[in-house]
């Protein structure tokens, strides 16, 4: 029987097999291969003796929290308190894209925007949608449900963006602790510790917003350009880094307004970090 590990406590793994839950222990062979089960693992189990017989090949995995086979990252992005930072947003998009995880942007606190600010946000949303990155707001639970359908999902985003609040909306039984923004620091506080997948409609969602996607130092500099999907253009040189090369189509598109200038500026900034 096959299923997905949704919880691990000590050496006991809870496996979801089509809605039926089995508490299983990994066979001893895993200890000799340095393979430890992770939440999100697709596994084969012996449902009679309650053993995990095999762990399927992982398509990706995260360290904190330890989750494998993540399909999508819901990037909760505050537009007020803390202020919208396209640099942080693009950094998180690059990070999850590099890990073969689909980025989905969820803007929060849009009710705090002025009319003019809402118009500017619409332009930003229109651009990200155009390059294939889906966007929503934390007030549209119906749309969020559709975007996450059938996927293993983690939440990420800057602290204070409302990740725990959104998780509590998706699953009120979680009753996750949320901290208000620190007035002095202008940022939120981390309040969650562990990871477990809970069922939401047809999706499995990590119950912790603790995944940090702000460190991109593990991405090789020459591969950063691949995490900016709209940079996939026919430049004169195949190995064009879109920095100082001549006849670079990416720079031409930026100058023509076809690529958002903040995206290109952030790319150059990340390469220099």
Where are these regions (language model features)?
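Structural detector for short beta-strands of small beta-barrel domains
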Residues: 1-9
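Helix-rich effector regions associated with P-loop NTPase G domains
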Residues: 11, 34-49, 56-73, 78, ...
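SH3/SH3-like beta-barrel fold
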Residues: 13-17, 24, 45, 52
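Beta-strand/loop nucleic-acid-binding surfaces
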Residues: 21-37
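Short, glycine-rich nucleotide/cofactor-binding loops
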Residues: 76-86
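Glycine-centered short loops/turns at secondary-structure junctions
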Residues: 100-101, 132
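Canonical P-loop GTPase G-domain recognition
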Residues: 112-161
């Amino acid at each position: 029987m096959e299923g997905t590990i949704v919880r691990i406590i000590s050496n006991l793994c809870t496996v979801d097999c089509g809605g039926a839950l089995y508490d299983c222990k990994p066979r001893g062979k895993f200890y000799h291969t340095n393979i430890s089960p992770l939440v999100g693992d697709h596994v084969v189990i012996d449902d009679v003796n309650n053993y995990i017989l095999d762990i399927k090949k992982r398509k990706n995995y995260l360290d904190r929290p330890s989750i494998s086979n993540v399909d999508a990252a819901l990037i909760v992005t505050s537009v007020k308190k803390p202020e919208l930072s396209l640099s942080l947003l693009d950094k998180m998009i690059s990070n999850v894209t590099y890990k073969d995880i689909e980025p989905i942007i969820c803007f929060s606190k849009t009710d705090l925007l002025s009319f003019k600010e809402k118009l500017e946000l619409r332009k930003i949303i229109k651009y990200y949608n155009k390059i294939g990155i889906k966007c929503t707001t934390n007030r549209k639970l119906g749309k969020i449900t559709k975007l996450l359908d059938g996927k293993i999902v983690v939440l990420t985003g800057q602290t204070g963006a409302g990740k725990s609040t959104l998780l509590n909306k998706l699953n009120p039984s979680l009753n996750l602790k949320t901290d208000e923004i620190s007035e002095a620091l202008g940022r939120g506080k981390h309040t969650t510790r562990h990871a477990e997948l809970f069922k939401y409609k047809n999706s499995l969602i990590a119950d912790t917003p603790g995944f940090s996607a702000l460190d991109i130092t593990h991405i090789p500099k020459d591969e950063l350009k691949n995490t900016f999907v709209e940079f996939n253009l026919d430049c004169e040189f195949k190995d064009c880094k879109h920095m100082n090369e001549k006849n670079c189509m990416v720079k031409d598109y930026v100058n023509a307004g076809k690529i958002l200038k903040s995206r290109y500026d952030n790319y150059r900034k990340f390469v220099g970090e």
